[in-house]
Amino acid sequence: MRNCKGLSILLCFLLVFFAMPFPAVAEEAEAMPVSEASEWSFSAFGSNTSVEKNPDPMINSDGSVKIVANGGKIASNEQGISFYYREVPSDANFEIKAKAEVLNFKGDDKQVSFGLMLMDQIGQHRNSEKHNSNYIAVGALDTIIKAFYMQESLTKTDMLSQTPSQGDIFELSIKKSGDNYVLTCNGTTETFTLPGLFSDTIYVGIYAARNAEIKFSDLNFTLDTKDIVDLSVDLSGMKTSYLVDEPLNLKGLKVTAHYSDGTSEELTEEDYIVTGFDSSTPGTNTICINVGEISKTIDLEILPLTCTKLTVKYLPAKTDYYLGDSFNPEGLKVIAEYNDGYKVTELTEDKYALYIAGKAAEDYVFSKAGTQKVEVISRENPSVKTGFEVNISDASIESLEISRKPEKTAYFIGDEPDLTGLVVYARYSDGSKVRLDKSEYEVKGFDSSAPGEKEITVYHKGKTVAFSVVVKEKEVMGIEVTKYPKTTYYIGETFNAEGLEVSKVYDNGDREPLTDFSVDASAFDGSTPGVYDVIISADGFDPITLKVTVREKTEYEWKAIRFGQSTSDSKNYVNFLDNGAVEIVALEGGGKIATDHDGITFYYTEIDAKDNFVLSADIKVKEYAKNPHDGQESFGIMARDAIGTPGDSSIFASNIAAIGGFSGGTKSPNGTQLFIRTGVSSPDGAGSKGIRRIMIKDEKPGPDNTYPAAEYRLTLAKTNSGFVGKLNDGEEVIFYEPDILNVQDSKIYVGFFAARLATIEVSNIELYVSSSETDAPRYIPPEAPVTPSLQILSLDKTSNVNYSLVVKPNVNGSITVKQGAEILVRDVTVNAGEKYSVDAVLEKNSENPFTVIFIPDDTQNLSSYEKIIKNFSVTMRTYNEGGNIYVSPNGTPYGDGTKDNPLDLDTAIAFVKEGQKIILMNGVYKRDSALVISRYNDGTAENRKYLVAEPGSRPVIDFDKKGQGVTLSGNYWYIEGIDFARSAPNYPGFIIGGNYNIVENCRFYENGDTGLQISRTDSSENIAEWPSYNKIINCESFDNRDPSENNADGFAAKLTCGVGNMFIGCVSHHNIDDGWDLYTKAGTGAIGPVIIDSCIAYENGTLTDGTVGKGDKNGFKLGGEGVPVQHIIKNSIAFNNGAVGFTSNSNPSVIAINNIAYNNAKGNLVFTSYSGIETHFVVDGFVSYNTEGAPRDSATGVPASDDNYLFDGTKSVNKSGEELTEKEFIERLLELISKIKSIK
């Protein structure tokens, strides 16, 4: 190894130069040591606990306590826990507090638990017998945060819906005062009064159970030693009258404690517990002030609400009528104000009455032309009323017109009428034509009791129109087999009609089973292969033929193979066990079941694709999926239409049908599913339509719930109707698509598989193969009806008066759009899946009501044909026009956007105008929800919208591991100088789905997935609609980590990003996976070329705290799945990454100009692709230098050049054999660093 002192100094410089200051999110204070460690004890007891699973806690020098519990449980009637506790008498009053930091938590197991607990009885240390005791606790249970207690039965109250994940910190406390208990988590409080919960001793402490590793710090126990003999309460300054649902206000209440020594002390709110408050019902409400065993009562008066104002928010969908029409209130929404603004709410229909001309509006028929007022009167306070006007035209009805007849015009005796598809219009004397609702006309004349032509008449307002239908008697068409016996036989077997059912078939589709029929199997020859006719006869009918097959018995050869991406001989293999079972292994990271391709261990046999089969086996799951799962692990039975080359780790795709353990995504449930992939036309995944799945059992399979601990027998079958899956003897589920495996090969490869992380043991295998030619014919199920819906896609908040209302139906139909009472469009045809836009002018600084009426076209197969009425309000507002909008962490929606009265961030984003700047004042903007810049919230090329830090500040938008990060779907935004931190698990810190955006001088860290990612934020499959022409400039991304520790990159432009996206002058380091990820999926298709210019990637794969990830760990990952995309990377540096510095990741078309790589663990440069793919790499001016013996560089098809210094395993040389010296390397490095520093 060469002398590298100079390089070490330079590397230190690089690390200091490129590492910006660390997160501005406030750090937690040092833990407060437990004052008397001898008072604390530890016990692990209860079901499923053991020395191995529940080791003694680690007591740290700072007083923190780490408890690791891989055994135990919190169940409905037992507790098995690791418990660090102290003892106090049951009559003691005290408070225990602690911070619980999650180091590991199995989020899919409801019996995993941790937190604070007070327990009545504890089990003997290291006794694993079942234990059940009264207790009260606050912490994790049922995968979320709860307050819960055991007293006869387990009672649970949700506190936080958050599932704990690695790095989360929960501030917990339990305060006991007499029989009252106050439980708190992160500021959320629950109070319980529980007499008799404890007997003699209370065991107070911290605990963990099942699969949790928790660090408890600031553990503090405070015992109240004062002897209170009485309380006095002064109500003179306290509010004692409340409206319904008004919160308790203790301001002005004086509570004084009197002690046994004769002294007295006025208490604070923290010193006493208030119980019994309930303002939900008018009347007297008695509350108790509790301190220890002493309590005082206070009577409060709860006053009923009084309606003081009504407002019509949305007019009815119909406000224009003709004489003789009935009033229709559909769509009407009324807002009530109670007690002069105390409460404002939308009323239900029973809370108000409608009157027209002094009469109830229900079924009111308009008999007078002109304008009429509809009164809206409060039923709660009839003196409060409002109203609106409707218009009645004096035009008279002239005729009815059938614009479309019903779909069904032929009937059988006894059929009910079906008017689906009938469209009727009324014509009026003013030339208008109005479509009638089904409720507006009557239909008479249908009679199916006798055959013949029937005239059906439509009636409306005294006018009629008629159409004809035909009624006939049903006729027997013949007989058919409705249940099939065995139809495939091996030589030597005899025909068996068991299970055969024959039915009469009528022309209306009815079937009636026959009991009297004969079967003639004389032509069947069980000694000779062939297809034979079995004749079925019944009196009065022509005989029918049941075909059966006789074939040679085939001994199917079983084989083992591993193939596909991420597989290897060390991770993917098959073992044949002494007990006759087959063990199929995919160790962690060994393969995957991805949306469009697979990498699997496969134990299989081959059958003819024309045949059907049933394959069953008992499955023992020894290991499956880490926690949390990463979405690509799977096991079970699989059938596929092609397999890869043995031992080849290239991308390989086929159509599949499978049953077994599967999730399909980190956010999807992981259970036993039937799933299929369709549309794949070639091994590269072209044409893939992705994976569809049906959940059979929503429980993660593992050693405890699979064979032999529990029955777990999987069955996968192919029939002429489709692919069928079944667990044990449960209900069959089916995909009615039998031909999906007839694409790539004339064979079906069927067997048992494992991927990513799964080890299974397969036994009692049963395979039955039959001839599809003679099996039961294909059943095509009726098409499932579509539930009609209408999306309103446009903004509900805007700063523009010129507005476009955008709607998108999922079925064909017609829409009418109203703005208030004004009709903007009427009965316009809209198509399923297509957007339709209606222009409107908004009233400035007001709320603008819209009503959209959608009538589905009833010629479609729908679950409902009722019209859909959607009310939608658009708030138009501006702030500080002509100036900047200021926001602060303490800003509110009621600010005016000035520096002295700032807005909150969401309001500013919703109402910023084109060309206007949102200025973020300094501070931490802590959130528990996503920050969304919606589609259509756009700037323009000339006037962007700005979201920038106040000069001299560094604001932090902290999602607190609860919010889903930033979603930027708008266009032409400029975002600068802001930190984006700690998004929720499996969500990027910042995702760009819009176009022409610039993000500059921002940092992304500690997020639950990639720091910043460019990918679509909707469901568009068209690359033209994917995010394009976005620039990321001088940004830094680090310490991003997903729960599975294998997916969070620093920056990404992958999967579904368009053209023209650029990263300039950015730095990515210490991310759990890659620095940059430009992954492309074959099934989704090529993404747009990305430019990476003057960027740096270092130390990726390891976090700043030393945590080593389980992902790829590359610096720049520049593609995926062999899809050619001409990404350009230039003037960039990669060093000290956990894997490869610059990798094409199978993309055969990367262009790399003037880049430097140094000491990357698995190579500085790896530009390769899969076998059979022609490469078109361009590598020019590449400098690769290594002092730690990494693998040699690889660039397939790149001719040697004097401009490239590639590492050959020992030294860096160019085409002429000139070796790059350390001095020359440093000079080139400094030159490039200088160039990167100049980026602005």
UniProtKB/Swiss-Prot annotation:
One of its GO terms (cellular component) is extracellular region. Inhibited by the metal chelator ethylenediaminetetraacetic acid (EDTA). Residues 27-551, 545-1240 are annotated as: Has catalytic activity. Its cofactor is Ca(2+). Pfam families: Big_3 (PF07523). It catalyses: Eliminative cleavage of (1->4)-alpha-D-galacturonan to give oligosaccharides with 4-deoxy-alpha-D-galact-4-enuronosyl groups at their non-reducing ends. It is an enzyme of class 4 (lyase). Optimum pH is 7. This is Pectate lyase L.
